Amino acid sequence: MVNVPKTRKTYCKGKECRKHTQHKVTQYKAGKASLFAQGKRRYDRKQRGYGGQTKQIFHKKAKTTKKVVLKLECVVCKTKAQLSLKRCKHFELGGDKKQKGQALQF
C-alpha cells in the first residue's frame, strides 16, 4: 500500500520560481476521449452499416496494475507538473501515517 501526503516540497520549473517550493498533490485522471479525434472518426465511419466488428478488440491483457501518476501544482506560481510512481495495487492520498507498534488495519 502506497500512502502519499497531499503536499510535498519539490523543485518548481516555473519561470517565477525555479527553486524548491510547496506543491499540492493530486492523482492524475485521464480525460474523456474526444469524438472528433481523427482515429475515432475513421473508426466510427468504418463501423457504420452491416459487416459487424471491423477491427480487433484486444483481449490478451497482461498487466494487473497501472502506474500511479501524481499531478503536482506549485502553490506560488500554479505551474503544474506530473510525476509517475511505481506500480501498486493500493494507492492512498493523504492517509494516516504509520505508527510503530500498531496492529495492521484494512
UniProtKB/Swiss-Prot annotation:
The keyword Ribonucleoprotein applies. One of its GO terms (cellular component) is ribonucleoprotein complex. InterPro entries: Ribosomal_eL44, Ribosomal_LSU_eL42, Ribosomal_zn-bd. GO terms for biological process: response to antibiotic; response to cycloheximide; translation. Coiled coil: none annotated. The keyword Ribosomal protein applies. This is Large ribosomal subunit protein eL42.
